[in-house]
Amino acid sequence: TSRTPLIFRDDKYRLAELCLKSFRESLGSLKVKLYALLDNCPQEYEHLLTRHFDDDSLELIRLDGVGNPATLMKQIEILLGQNSSDLVYFAEDDYFYLPNQFREMVEFARSRDDVHFVSPYDHPDYYTRRLHQYPSRVVTFGSRHWRTTGVTNMTFLTKKQVLMEAHRVFKTYTRRNRGILIWLSLTKHKALNPIYAFPYLMHERRTFKKLARSWLSCWRHILFGRRWNLWVPMPSIATHMEKTALAPCVDWIGTIRAEVGPLQELMQETTGANGGRDAM
């Protein structure tokens, strides 16, 4: 969950409600099967899911506080075992989606053989951090440009066959080997080349340590495995709700205001209902 979300900072349920509603609206008329992993979640979250998805399209899976790594392993097991779709989607619960836009991501994934993974999120770090200063391939499709990138978060679309081939890399996910390190390995980001990695040792020690952990955890794939392509849309189809990491070129404040009402009114409502706590 976002550390400092744009809205509902102290109310995870309302944040989840807002994001889930936007996800459902972004799907539009797409027929989906949603496997909801509830890891030690209160029962009210089950009611939230059943309000937005009918019984035929929803399967609730209750877990007893197993944590993120085990939850990811369960997701992989479920999605590789299902036969409903050739495309599978990993969704974190703190993303806000634009309405009726998810279909474009699905169509893009099916339009090209070189589309292996697709994130809905055009991360602002792509434009500011040294780690992302590298050439990208850019294509047009639908109403957007799409570019290749080296890393993303753990919300992404892929083909079942691709997941089958790459799942061993995802299974290296632990509390220390987080998503960024897995993506560096899958896309074989140039920073994993020792020649490019050395400047990080001098100027960005934290990034250098991440690169080193990626090598330690996934060296076999880095050396001998396939390079996979990760694509993101420009402009974004969704944004992470961390208030300092909103996707660029979209009026997220205005869009969210249209969903929940003027933010000032929302702050007053939340403050009154929750004993003076901040809403944003």
What does each of the following model-derived ranges do?
Residues 13-31:
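Short, acidic, metal-binding catalytic loop of nucleotide-sugar glycosyltransferases
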Residues 26-35, 58, 86:
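Short loop->beta transition adjacent to catalytic acidic/histidine clusters or analogous donor-positioning motifs
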Residues 39:
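Acidic ATP/Mg2+-coordinating residue in the GHKL
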Residues 42-86:
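Active-site-proximal specificity loops/subdomain of glycosyltransferases
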Residues 96-171:
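Conserved catalytic core of nucleotide-sugar-dependent glycosyltransferases
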Residues 167-280:
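C-terminal catalytic/acceptor-binding lobe
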